[in-house]
């Protein structure tokens, strides 16, 4: 391979960010330290003044975390990335530095429950926050204001899988004001399936707990974008506001997990398509929601901006919430648990679990029905996942 040739996604998941260790270690070294020694007082001064690159204190940067951040930046097509100790750490660290009292935030109505709760909490600081249906571009246009500082979106959205036209929302936001930033949560898609930065988004956030790590054993997050914005996220959002710093050991685990991201995502998606087909055929399933279905709202948008349609599926069963509980209480292979993107298939009830922070009215506005079930399709044999779901559905 020539030096200037761009490497494939699969190759970068393995090699991007790799450190040439003093001892020749193939694996990423874990720098388990809180602080770093300066050669002299002058060097310490230069590093604090940002006149010299180097490490100071692990809350501000660590070589293990740095390697991980470089890997994600390459995969997302970003100049830089910041790792955090949770997805909410990434989201809050990416919002706090850029807002002040009197600003307006426009967010999609269907969001991860804790993101929704956070955006409601900051209203007490005189931040005007509005939640709208961003799948409707006319709604976006109508609600943008002169003081709109941030447009915040998830696509596919949690849990309804709503697809928002990233490129068109960015155009509207930038036309509204050069000071309007667009932040996109790319957790459900991962950089393998979607790259919001290439569509004009300013900052992309992730819960790395999910597909990026992929093994259900770490809580972590990422923010990525330009070097200028990531400096603000790290040195203001993370350092001064949230203190949400990822441990070096967890950074090592995610670095290792990300090496198989493409392989895992291919299998997740392949399994999901089989599960979707089976759910559509079951007599006790009322409706299946999946961006890959041709009758799914904004299917064409998903087709345009995503490489494939992801590994999350939601469905409603006949009989409402009690029937849904019957299904969840009777699965044997699937695990009744929140989170997603694990090797295991996870099933949960958004209205009473992940989105319990939503009021009844907000649930209705977000399109989260009382009987909606969310399924994160894992890496087990697809036929065995289907068999388990069918036997539980048969009990309704």
List PLM regions with ranges.
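Conserved PLP-enzyme active-site core in the AAT-like
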Residues: 2-5, 10-22, 80-284, 289, ...
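PLP-dependent enzyme catalytic core of the Aspartate aminotransferase-like
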Residues: 149, 175-176, 264, 345-396
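Short, well-ordered beta-strand elements within core beta-sheets of diverse protein domains
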Residues: 253-263, 311-318, 374-378
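N-terminal "arm"/small-domain region of PLP-dependent enzymes with the aminotransferase-like
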Residues: 2-62, 70
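Conserved N-terminal alpha-helix of the aminotransferase class I/II PLP-enzyme fold
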Residues: 40-89, 114-121
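Conserved small-domain helix->loop->beta segment predominantly found in fold-type I
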Residues: 273-342, 358-364
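C-terminal core of ALDH-fold dehydrogenases
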Residues: 12-31, 322-362
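A common structural junction motif
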Residues: 241-242, 330-339, 392-396
């Amino acid at each position: 391979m020539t030096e200037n040739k761009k490497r494939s996604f699969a190759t970068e998941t393995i090699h991007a960010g790799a450190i040439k260790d003093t001892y020749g270690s193939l694996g990423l070294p874990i720098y388990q330290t809180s602080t770093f020694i300066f050669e002299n007082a002058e060097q310490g001064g230069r590093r604090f003044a940002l006149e010299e690159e180097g490490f100071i204190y692990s809350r501000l940067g660590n070589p293990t975390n740095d390697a991980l951040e470089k890997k994600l930046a390459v995969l997302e097509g970003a100049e830089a990335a910041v790792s955090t100790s949770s997805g909410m750490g990434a989201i809050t660290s990416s919002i706090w530095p850029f807002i002040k009292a009197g600003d307006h935030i426009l967010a999609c109505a269907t969001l991860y429950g804790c993101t929704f709760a956070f955006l409601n909490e900051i209203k007490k600081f005189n931040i005007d926050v509005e939640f709208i249906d961003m799948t409707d571009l006319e709604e976006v246009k109508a609600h943008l204001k002169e003081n709109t500082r941030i447009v915040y979106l998830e696509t596919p959205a949690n849990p309804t899988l709503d697809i928002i036209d990233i490129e068109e929302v960015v155009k509207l936001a930038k036309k509204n004001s050069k000071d309007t930033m667009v932040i996109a949560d790319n957790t459900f898609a991962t950089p393998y399936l979607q790259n919001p930065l290439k569509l004009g988004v300013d900052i992309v956030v992730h819960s790395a707990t999910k597909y990026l790590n992929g093994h259900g054993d770490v809580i972590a997050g990422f923010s990525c974008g330009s070097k200028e914005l990531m400096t603000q996220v790290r040195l203001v959002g993370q350092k001064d506001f949230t203190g949400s710093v990822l441990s070096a050991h967890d950074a090592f685990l995610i670095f290792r997990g990300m090496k198989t991201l493409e392989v895992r995502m291919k299998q997740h998606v392949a399994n999901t398509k089989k599960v979707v087909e089976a759910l559509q055929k079951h007599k006790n399933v009322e409706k299946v929601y999946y961006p890959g279905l041709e009758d799914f709202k904004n299917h064409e948008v998903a087709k345009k901006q995503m490489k494939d349609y992801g590994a999350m599926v939601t469905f409603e069963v006949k009989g409402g919430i009690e029937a849904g509980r019957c299904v969840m209480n009777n699965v044997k292979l699937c695990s009744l648990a929140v989170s997603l993107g694990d090797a295991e298939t996870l099933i949960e009830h958004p209205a009473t679990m992940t989105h319990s922070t939503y009021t009844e009215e907000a649930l209705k506005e977000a399109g989260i029905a009382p009987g909606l079930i969310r399924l994160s399709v894992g890496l087990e044999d697809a036929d065995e996942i289907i068999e388990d779901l069918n036997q539980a559905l048969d009990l309704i």
